[in-house]
Amino acid sequence: MSGFTNKDGRQNLAPCFNFRSSPFRLTVGERELKLEEDKNQLSKGLDPWTSNPTASASTLHYLLQEKERAQQAHEQLQIYQQQQGFGSFLQHRIRQPASRGPGGGGGGGDGGGSSGESTPVDALATAFGAGRIVRSAAGRKDRHSKVCTARGLRDRRVRLAAHTAIRFYDVQDRLGYDRPSKAVDWLMRNAKAAIDELPDRAEAPPPPAAASTEQPEGTEQANSTSYGFGNTTGGTMTSAASAAAGSFLPHSLGADRVSDSVKSLFPSSSTASGAASAGHDEYRGSPPDLLSRTTSNQQPQELCLTLQSNQHQIFSHVSSNHHGMISSAGVPGWPDHSQRMQAWHAPENSTGDGRGGGNGDGYMFAMPSRQGLDQSQLFSHGEPLQSSGRGWASARAWLDPLAVAAIHHQPSTMAAGQVGFGHLVGGAGGGGGFMGFLAPAAQRLEGEEEHGSEVIR
């Protein structure tokens, strides 16, 4: 290192480097590498010209904070502009009803409430022709924009039904327009006369309440006539009685198979002229000529209670072994001749077990009442019970007292008996009949070994 002499002859004491022997002498490639390293250090927040990394890090942190402040200020400015734009839109909406008058303002308020669309807070109202387009400030696509109408904000895009869209595009193709909006403008121009005749925002009349309530009643009446016993003069059955009748009466049975021997199935009563309210009272209070009226018509009606009769005298005697505890003596309103009701679908060559060929169906009969049990107690379990013949164990718990009374009573003590009608059930092959009165053939009383008939429960 040596000094050098200026033009005026004075010596410059500034240091002078010998670049030939200096280690700082770098080639072009080395200089480029050095610049790249400097850039990398600057990007990492390190100052290559200083040896204090703490100072360079604090400087970079300050720059980042300033950048964040600038971003926050920009966002606040955007929010302020959005609020100003939306405020002008609200002021415009407030001035519109005032210019229309009190009548128009009231209609506009009702229309805005009935639109069902909430006004977005971040929306911007942009003037577009004669109307306004409300765009979202979040930068979403144009399909989310809305227009200001007399009844509030509405979507610009309109969904059409499939057949309507097909017809509309056919009209557009025939007109030769490339955009659907042009076809809509053409349709509105041609329908201007009809549009002008329309009232302003006519409200649709509310649907009549009477028409909506009459339809279910008609349906219930149709169900009651198809599921009931065909009582056309005594009034229609209620919905509960209709459901109870439809729960066990088959549809496939016709009225042509009804025998004359079962016309006197129900006890005669001069006061029972109308249908009962619900449950077992429906069947117990039926008029005496219920079946005769339905079968004597010129056009046979569908009678779901179809019973086939054979010539076995089921109810004409009482068995000596107490298996046929059946009696109709002393029952008021019943005729003196024997009453019988054969099993459903009983074959002609039915066996002598009293079950109609073992099809799981039983008979309806009169059973004497136990002392201390009145008619209401006998029918305390009048709910419709469904059984397939294998579920007798669940019903025997409350039938045991009646079974004991039926077995140990003599036929002479059955003068003041009550008529008990159970619910008709059908079995798949293992016992059945009227719930609460007949037991399956497999379940016998203790000490009895006889076969060929059912034990009456």
UniProtKB/Swiss-Prot annotation:
Residues 58-84 form a coiled coil. Residues 101-115 have a biased composition (Gly residues). Residues 212-230 have a biased composition (Polar residues). Residues 95-121, 199-231, 263-299 are annotated as: Disordered. It is found in: Nucleus. Keywords: Activator, Coiled coil, Developmental protein, DNA-binding, Nucleus, Transcription, Transcription regulation. Residues 140-198 form the TCP domain. InterPro entries: TF_TCP_subgr, Transcription_factor_TCP. One of its GO terms (cellular component) is nucleus. The keyword Transcription applies. One of its GO terms (molecular function) is DNA-binding transcription factor activity. Residues 268-278 have a biased composition (Low complexity). Transcription activator. Binds the promoter core sequence 5'-GGNCC-3'. Forms homodimers and heterodimers. This is Transcription factor PCF7. The gene is PCF7.
